[in-house]
């Protein structure tokens, strides 16, 4: 049998990945997230964000905005504005209460997960709401096939159900609309929830296409009540509000509060009843930020459950938006550096709410461990909200990416070498200008220049430029030893400056080499006192020490 040296085998695997020779980022962060809220790039973003918000009409629109990190209980940034025209709060601040409207859907799912986990997602809803099991399916266009509607599809806007059964039905407020059919008394919408839900038309078969449904979350709450024997408002309070000390959050709208935004009064006092799990909750900006921070931290859920939750479940008709449970996932292109035309895709897990003059949102960037809470109300609320949203995407995500890049350079960049006498092995780690991720520009193993060997043996995929390895963090961190942590990265070979192709497939090209079951593309750094002291490649069987 022909034998190969470890170095040769490493680059046989590398050669197979050189067809495009591009820096094709994997899904996930390019660098470990920044924990320091005073990082210079984050500090500089505040003034830019304030400048972007100058276009908002502050006379007619009240708002509260908080940007926060998973790594600190404080805020990276906050700003508040009290409209001088019809606002309902003397002074808007961090504890002012706003109607959340459809953000309630995310809170409902969070409470369900905290109480019951996600083991029920694939179960049919008919198992937990017996009345639905008795509903006949005579006409597939007229009748919902409830046996195909799962608990998870209700949470993920993929149940195929219509929007709701009464909120937008004009028969609740007027007896006749010119040109519309006359209704029998039995057809007029009343407060018999399940009977009316069973009378609704389907939107589509479940899991075919996403559709916005508020009543889906009413059914999700009914299922939780039938499983646990507890009222759903009690589940929300006991599983979320109390453990997180959310003292300015409410399932029923508070009637005796004065620090509220209640313009118009009718919108504030709207009682959604059993539809509240889909839009009836209220909270302050500070409480909403604490809720978002707890998700990023996995405070109430096991980390594996959080990772399953922060994932798409179905796509929409645009490549830039997908749906989760019930996340409205925006895919945003973040530049590697401010002057670079090289970008990577960052998924933002958001839930927006709105009704009347209110527009609200919670948005999380797991790649950066940051989030934002946005509350707006007033005559120009949508324009204000859009300005804040775009500024968050363009300014705060870019700043978080830059801050993480600076931290990665300070922590990991440098020259490392073997300590063993006579072992000519070394590695140089740094950044490639205008490209995401750490970059290995030199790698010598036992006297062999493995980067030169690889590019000479396999070529550059027809591309010019410097050849090397991009290192991406894998979310695997060992902190068992006090004062030290081991952080795992994986390496992807390529050529600097190659334009990214939409069809790049780094996820399918990784981990191609095993040497005695040791990975050849793994790089494990030991960080002490905020600085990497060593880097190990298990496949090469070498540890390199900072020099």
Swiss-Prot record:
Entry keyword set: Antibiotic biosynthesis, Glycoprotein, Hydrolase, Signal
InterPro entries linked to this entry: Beta-lactam-related (IPR001466), Beta-lactam/transpept-like (IPR012338), Beta-lactamase-like_AB/R (IPR051478)
Molecular function in Gene Ontology: hydrolase activity
Keyword Glycoprotein attached: yes
Pfam families: Beta-lactamase
Function of the molecule: Beta-lactamase-like protein; part of the gene cluster that mediates the biosynthesis of sordarin and hypoxysordarin, glycoside antibiotics with a unique tetracyclic diterpene aglycone structure. First, the geranylgeranyl diphosphate synthase sdnC constructs GGDP from farnesyl diphosphate and isopentenyl diphosphate. The diterpene cyclase sdnA then catalyzes the cyclization of GGDP to afford cycloaraneosene.
Protein name: Beta-lactamase-like protein sdnR
Species annotation: Sordaria araneosa (Pleurage araneosa)
């Amino acid at each position: 049998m022909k034998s190969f040296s470890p170095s040769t085998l490493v680059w046989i695997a590398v050669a197979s990945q050189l067809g495009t020779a591009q820096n094709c980022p994997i899904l996930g962060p390019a660098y470990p997230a920044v924990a320091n809220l005073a990082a210079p790039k984050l500090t500089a973003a505040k003034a830019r964000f304030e400048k972007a918000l100058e276009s908002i009409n502050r006379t007619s629109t009240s708002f509260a905005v908080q940007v926060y990190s998973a790594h600190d209980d404080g805020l990276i940034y906050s700003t508040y504005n009290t409209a001088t025209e019809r606002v309902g709060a003397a002074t808007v601040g961090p504890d002012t209460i706003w109607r959340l409207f459809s953000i309630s859907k995310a809170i409902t799912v969070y409470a369900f997960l905290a109480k019951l986990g996600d083991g029920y997602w694939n179960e049919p809803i008919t198992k937990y709401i017996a009345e639905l099991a008795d509903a006949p399916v005579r006409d597939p266009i007229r009748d919902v096939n409830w046996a195909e509607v799962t608990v998870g599809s209700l949470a993920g806007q993929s149940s195929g159900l219509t929007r709701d059964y009464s909120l937008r039905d004009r028969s609740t407020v007027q007896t006749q609309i010119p040109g519309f059919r006359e209704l029998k008394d039995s057809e007029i919408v009343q407060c018999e929830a399940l009977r009316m839900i069973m009378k609704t038309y389907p939107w589509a078969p479940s899991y075919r296409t996403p559709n916005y449904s508020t009543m889906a979350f009413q059914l999700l709450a009914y299922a939780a009540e039938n499983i646990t024997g507890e009222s759903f408002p009690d589940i929300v309070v006991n599983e979320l509000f109390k453990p997180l000390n959310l003292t300015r959050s409410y399932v029923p709208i508070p009637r005796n509060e004065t620090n509220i935004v209640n313009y118009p009064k009718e919108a504030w006092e709207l009682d959604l009843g059993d539809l509240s799990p889909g839009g009836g909750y209220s909270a302050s900006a500070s409480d909403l930020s604490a809720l978002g921070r707890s998700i990023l931290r996995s405070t109430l859920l096991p980390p594996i459950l959080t990772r399953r939750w922060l994932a798409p479940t179905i796509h929409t008709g645009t490549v830039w938006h997908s749906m989760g449970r019930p996340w409205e996932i925006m895919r945003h292109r973040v530049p590697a550096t401010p002057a670079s035309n090289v970008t990577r895709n960052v998924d933002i897990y958001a839930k927006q709410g709105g009704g009347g003059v209110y527009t609200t949102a919670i948005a999380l960037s797991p790649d950066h461990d940051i989030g934002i809470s946005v509350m707006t109300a007033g005559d120009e609320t949508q324009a204000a909200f859009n300005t804040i949203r775009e500024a968050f995407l363009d300014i705060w995500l870019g700043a978080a990416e830059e801050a993480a890049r600076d931290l990665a350079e300070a922590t990991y960049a440098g020259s490392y070498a073997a300590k063993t006498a006579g072992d000519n092995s070394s590695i140089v780690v740094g950044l490639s200008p205008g490209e995401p991720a750490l970059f290995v520009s030199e790698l010598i193993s036992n006297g062999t220049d493995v980067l030169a060997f690889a590019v000479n043996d396999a070529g550059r995929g027809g591309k010019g430029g410097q050849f090397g390895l991009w290192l991406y963090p894998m979310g695997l961190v060992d902190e068992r030893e006090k004062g030290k942590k081991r952080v795992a990265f994986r390496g992807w070979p390529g050529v600097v400056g190659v334009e990214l192709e939409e069809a790049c497939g780094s996820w399918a090209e990784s981990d191609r080499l095993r040497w005695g079951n040791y990975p050849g593309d793994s790089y494990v750094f030991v960080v002490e006192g905020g600085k990497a002291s060593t880097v190990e490649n298990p496949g090469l069987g070498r540890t390199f020490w900072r020099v």
